[in-house]
């Protein structure tokens, strides 16, 4: 059954950008898709209605989305003015990094609530970080070094952990049974 579900991966170790259009996202609306890559997204403008891991979300400006490998997504509706910043790491690259050890305590929460609204100042900080990465990515041979890509991935993962610690009610909440199973 799982083989019948389309899979989304990235052909390069790392990509970053802000040029995803509603037209591109709408191509993922016809069917659910399994994420093989690790993807981080910041909604800057517009909105997206999507189902992530069987939960429907309305993604709006200042929402940060974490899509670790193994999650499922289906896009339902995208506004014409949508603007998203994104960073993605291929499944091949992610498979060579022991990120699970870093986020073990938060992985169940991330799978349960992958969309996190950020305060405007924090969202602006992330926009600036994406902008800097996009500029660096556009320079020749800047992002060929796997150690640099690993450092960028680590920054994103640590950033996600801090976001969940500081901007969600989950840090001290008891774990649901699904979260306990995911953690195991």
Explain the meaning of each model-derived region.
Residues 124, 143-151:
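Short, solvent-exposed positions on alpha-helices
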Residues 2-11, 76-138, 158-166:
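A hydrophobic/aromatic-rich effector-binding and dimerization subdomain
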Residues 142-146, 169-172:
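Short, surface-exposed loop/turn segments at secondary-structure junctions
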Residues 59-72, 88:
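Conserved metal-binding segment of the jelly-roll/cupin
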Residues 1-60:
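Generic protein-terminus/edge-of-domain signal
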Residues 171-184:
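A short, Lys/Arg-enriched amphipathic alpha-helix from helix-turn-helix/homeodomain DNA-binding modules
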Residues 151-159:
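Short, residue-level hotspots on alpha-helical faces of the histone-fold
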Residues 49-51, 67, 73-79:
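Short beta-strand His + acidic residue motifs that chelate non-heme Fe in jelly-roll/DSBH
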């Amino acid at each position: 059954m799982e083989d019948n579900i389309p899979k989304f991966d990235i052909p390069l170790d790392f990509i970053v950008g802000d040029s995803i259009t509603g037209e591109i996202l709408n191509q993922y609306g016809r069917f659910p898709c399994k994420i093989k890559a690790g993807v981080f997204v910041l909604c800057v403008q517009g909105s997206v209605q999507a189902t992530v891991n069987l939960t429907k979300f309305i993604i709006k400006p200042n929402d940060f989305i974490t899509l670790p490998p193994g999650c499922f997504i289906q896009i339902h509706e995208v506004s014409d003015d949508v603007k998203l910043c994104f960073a993605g790491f291929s499944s091949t690259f992610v498979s060579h990094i022991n990120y699970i050890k870093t986020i073990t305590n938060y992985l169940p929460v991330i799978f349960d609530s992958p969309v996190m609204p950020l305060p405007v100042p924090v969202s602006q900080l992330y926009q600036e970080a994406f902008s800097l990465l996009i500029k660096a990515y556009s320079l020749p041979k800047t992002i060929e070094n796997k150690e640099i890509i690993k450092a960028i991935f680590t920054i994103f993962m640590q950033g996600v952990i801090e976001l969940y610690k500081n901007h969600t009610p989950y840090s001290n909440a008891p774990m649901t049974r699904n979260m306990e199973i995911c953690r195991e």
